From Swiss-Prot:
Superkingdom of this protein's organism: Bacteria
Protein name: Large ribosomal subunit protein uL22
A Gene Ontology biological process term: translation
Classification of source organism: Bacteria, Pseudomonadati, Pseudomonadota, Betaproteobacteria, Burkholderiales
Keywords per UniProt: Ribonucleoprotein, Ribosomal protein, RNA-binding, rRNA-binding
Species name: Verminephrobacter eiseniae (strain EF01-2)
Name of the coding gene: rplV
SUPFAM superfamilies: Ribosomal protein L22
Length: 110
């Protein structure tokens, strides 16, 4: 069975926080991975759960895959563009605030 993937780009989440959750489900069966994500109390868990559900739906629709056989083959979180903002400080100065984004890649297969 071919591998199927789903990608979510530009998520307002730091890469380190996303990788923390991605490491929990790498290599697991999809039903077990969804169960882990449902009970993980992190912002990244909800985001990664949606991408995983999209990959499962892609496999079911495009490849007619059996959901019970699917496993999370690869999952990785890469750094995206950083949004740069400025914050006013005392005496007419300003500081830079960086708001990181990331890209989430999920591949499912047998």
């Amino acid at each position: 069975m071919p591998e199927t993937h789903a990608i979510l780009r530009g998520v307002r989440l730091s890469v380190d926080k996303g990788r923390l959750v991605a490491d929990l489900i790498r290599g697991k069966k999809v039903d077990q991975a969804l169960n882990i994500l449902n009970f993980t109390q992190k912002k990244a868990a909800g985001i990664i759960r949606k991408v995983l559900e999209s990959a499962i739906a892609n496999a079911e629709h495009n490849d007619s895959a059996d959901i019970d056989e699917l496993k999370v083959k690869t999952i990785h979180v890469e750094q995206g563009t950083t949004l740069k903002r400025s914050a006013a400080r005392a005496k007419g100065r300003g500081n830079r605030i960086s708001k990181p984004t990331c890209h989430v890649y999920v591949t499912v297969g047998n």
